[in-house]
């Protein structure tokens, strides 16, 4: 049954590809620059929030309303052919959020997919995309920037992930920071994720290579090699949002 289902999905996508192949290049370009609201069936809601000198663009999306043809709006739709449904919906919502963020800087393009699966931004700007549940988040800046959004860990998840995220020294700092440990560990994870994304050259650095030095009500200070990184953070309902920018 699974094999047959996979074959049906593959055939469906191939039919969509063949359909697009019949459209002229000029027409495809026009479609991609037009409003995605007229081309994407997946239901989305856009909101924005000022944070740490930037505007965060949130897109809430309904995965149940997603259709395979929604991907045809993306210039790189073929690269998602073998992705799972969850990946496709998150990716689409993230790119929609990125479009809103890029409009602030006068761009009308969709970030492509890089060799490391990272978003490829237009020359002259940097950006970052994150997902959590049915929420996608994007931000754009003139300097390297990283953004992350995470649902606060449960107590069990926090226990299971602790040793993969923080060192014993960091554990002690977090235990003394005044936050419930699941929240503190979620913040540590998210802050390190944003710091990694903000690195212009993303290496194979481990989470433990990013050391949390201190925390206050607005920032987490992270040390990596010879630099200190300030990561802004806030709690929005049951999620943690972090942002790191390299000056």
Task: For each feature predicted by the language model, list its residue ranges.
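Core catalytic alpha/beta fold that binds nucleotide/phospho-ligands
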Residues: 21, 26-247
